[in-house]
Amino acid sequence: MPRQRRGLRARPRRHSAPVPWPSNPVSRFSRHYFYFHFTNQPYPEDRKGCYLCFRVERTQGGLSSEVGSGVFENEFYPKEPVHAEICFLNWFKAQPAFQAQRLAPEEKYQVTWFMSWSPCFQCARQVAKFLRDHTSVQLSILAARLYYPRRPQYQQGLRSLQGAGAHVAVMTPADFASCWEMFVDDHKKRFWYWKGIYINSCSLAKSLEDILGNPEN
């Protein structure tokens, strides 16, 4: 399957998933992709990929500067699948500022993820290990939906992220609007809340609260 070139924004057919993007991050994506993949219906059809919108800020000497931002999707072709979280870690570890590894005690990286799905348990373990090994990195994960929230392994994966210092939360309507503003091509167009966005967000947040607050769940 040919790769979609940067700048081309194919509109997905109704009830069909768009073709995957290359592994390199893009700065923004189309509003059609956003509405298709970031709906917070608990179990939507044909949303098998995961989109990760990220922003990285570096704080040094009391001053903050942006290191980078963009959008990753799960990588499927032509190699073995690589989830969006791992694509981000590979990108982040290659950044010159991070590779220098000469961080002063007060120097921090603030990383924010807006994700269409919460991390799977395998990715959660890898991200948690990365955070434990790099205490200068502070991660906030805001997920539109929870991935297999009733399965113990996935629940434990989310708890491992919290235990490693990550802030894990469900996206609120305000978070969806912020993600639209930062990462959607047509962000100047009005963001329309879809039916059920409020109640779905509250329901998913309650489920996540139960998972994170109950180790025996």
Predicted feature residues:
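Zinc-dependent deaminase catalytic domain
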Residues: 1-217
